[in-house]
Amino acid sequence: YRSDSLEPLSVVSNRYKVVQPKDVLHFYKDLVSAGGFELETAGVLKGGRKLWALAKTGQEARIKGNDRIKAYLLLATSCDGTLCTTAQFTSVRVVCNNTLQLATRDSNGAVKVPHSTQFDPRQVKEALGIGFASWESFMTNLKQLSQRTVSPQEADSFIRTVLNEPELTEDNVQGSKMFQTVNSLYQGKGMGSELSSASGTAWGLVNAMTEYVDHHRRARNQDNRLDSAWFGQGALLKQKAFNQALTLLH
């Protein structure tokens, strides 16, 4: 329960290892200090059930000159068992604030500790050191995606595959509203879609999908949208888009 309002947050089993917010914040500060990071912002979701923080890593790269990508460390835990204590590297595209988990074929850039396991900050730090080593590989992938031009047919197929959208028929000549939104973001309505790195490229397709999830996908409120984009179905959809885009490189 919350100590300020005494509002119950959840009913958990006796195997559940409680991680107090103050302990997590101390760990966050210790971790960002050890890594030379800078804690930028923190907040809660779901009425205090989830606690999160973003730390700047200081890593930044540019794609085709003016498309800036920054690396952040996203730290989160829950008080109701719905989320493992998690530390994951996340990229932020400066022009639009789209977020994408820093992942490669060999690493997902995340460390997760179930609440049934004793929280060991040292173990998390060591694992994160391995995850952060994938930054260069991740940026190499992004640059390759920005150089991969796609045809209108490939773009159409990509969006349909990621959204599980059926092919157009006589009865369905436009596609779903979701398909139309993502397609319009790719075609020029998306933030930064006019940049040479994104216009008509596989990187542009990825950003159309991440912008849709982060800023346009239907949600009851911004709290729910952010929760989904970072930890739920939205995060899975963005990762699916990224993985699908990588197949265009071969």
Report the location of each language-model feature.
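Ser/Thr-rich, low-complexity intrinsically disordered terminal regions
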Residues: 34-63, 163, 167, 238
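N-terminal low-complexity, intrinsically disordered segments
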Residues: 1-45
